[in-house]
Amino acid sequence: MALMVLPFIGPLSVLEGLIALTTVCVVYLLLKHFNKEIPGGLRQLPGPTPLPIIGNLLKLGSKPYLSLTEMSKRFGDVFQIQIGMRPVVVLSGNETVRQALIKQGDDFSGRPDLYSFQFINDGKSLAFSTDQAGVWRARRKLAYSALRSFSSLEGSNAEYSCMLEEHICKETEHLVKEIEKVMKTEGKFDPYRYIVVSVANVICGMCFGRRYDHHDQELVGLVNLSEDFVQVTGSGNPADFIPALRYLPSKAMKKFVEINNRFQSFVQKIVNEHSATYDKDNIRDITDSLIDHCEDRKLDENSNIQMSDEKVVGIVNDLFGAGFDTISTALSWAVGYLVAYPDIEKGLFEEIKENIGLNRNPTISDRSNLPLTDAFILEIFRHSSFLPFTIPHCTTRDTSLNGYYIPKDTCVFINQWQINHDPKLWQDPSSFNPDRFLSEDGSEVNRLDGEKVMVFGLGKRRCIGEVIARNEVFLFLAIMIQKLCFEEMPGEPLDMTPEYGLTMKHKRCNVRASLRLKDGC
């Protein structure tokens, strides 16, 4: 799950009693940092002057991705800020980020030892763990293998090319029926409310081998738990950047730990059930696949690393979280853009009608024949930039970038929003225009431009579920456009302003949807 532990602290009155206690420590750490000897030929990182205790916190505001983008115009693609007592290097610019995460990938592949990370999956999270490189690589390899092997399994019949396609197609059909029902009774619906349940059902089917009714209390509870997680993490954890605060009572931190424990217990229960009923000759889902990979074997012949049940729980937890919030947020934005740009929606439907028809569902293999749909998705990722930052990185050794010295164990933020809105890369970046990704005749997507869009990270920490996520967004969206026509609700104007948080969502809204006729809406 793409967590952003940036921003940030709310009212600062809680710090008043700590000033005397922490001043000496702050001064010592600042002096130690700024006086560190810079190797010959390298420069000290530029950046704004920090205040005592809080650093540059006040400069970040409620939309740090915008604040840091403005700072990059002044200080360049590599600069340093101070959040509380922790120095943070901020990377912007397509070439700079690719240099760091790909060409110097080993140097920037770490995760910072933030206080809150130890409570995510009980410290065993694949995405957030600060495990040593050998352990992390082995677990990542296992998770990727299980994810890929199960998602590519044959479907239950020839209609589906793989298990993933079957789960998505069936769930989208349920989604269309649910929307049809609510439109008959209410005349409007909240897209996110229905999409998030459908996406959760797909990942439940993949990970746990079960599907829930849309109104099932266990599923609704999971969705609510995820939304609580997004809300509490979106406000940030001050103790990550001001260590003394971890000794003070915090309602937000208490809720954060509580949410993680509840979800951990849910996944642990399912893993226990799978372990008890595991049959090597009948792999039912990703959880079974993980157990199968780990059963009495080592992950890496050279590393002597074995996988415990606890690590399996952590991986399943990560896969569920990552496949849940990111995809549902992307699809919610997609519906918003369809409503906001009816001419584009009409063009997308015509493309699907012409290339696939209306008598069968789109499939993953149809993606190459629907360039406008593919370009539309890329522009959603770019324009919304609903994942404005990657999970924070950390340097694993003393290194340099663009001539600047960066010490080992430095926290690093990757500003994906800046890259996706950089006028050096994109003409008129503030406008929504899927055509920017199409060839002159509109027959294909320019893959080089598509690869510039930052959403799933890069390099050694790139999201392992990226291919599955892209296919899932495509298939959900293509089927919805084929079956439904979305319109703005009279008297309820659509507000596409992003709300900063774990993932950036637009404001919740109601829209109308109707089953399509052969000629369109």
UniProtKB/Swiss-Prot annotation:
Topological category with respect to the lipid bilayer: Peripheral membrane protein
Alphabetic keyword roster: Endoplasmic reticulum, Heme, Iron, Membrane, Metal-binding, Microsome, Monooxygenase, Oxidoreductase
Protein name stated in the entry: Cytochrome P450 1A1
Localization per Swiss-Prot or TrEMBL: Endoplasmic reticulum membrane; Microsome membrane
Organism expressing this protein natively: Oryzias latipes (Japanese rice fish)
GO CC annotation: endoplasmic reticulum membrane; intracellular membrane-bounded organelle
InterPro entries linked to this entry: Cyt_P450, Cyt_P450_CS, Cyt_P450_E_grp-I, Cyt_P450_E_grp-I_CYP1, Cyt_P450_sf
Cofactor: heme
One Pfam family cited in the UniProt record for this chain: p450
Protein family (similarity comment): Belongs to the cytochrome P450 family.
Top EC category: oxidoreductase
CDD domains noted in UniProt: CYP1A
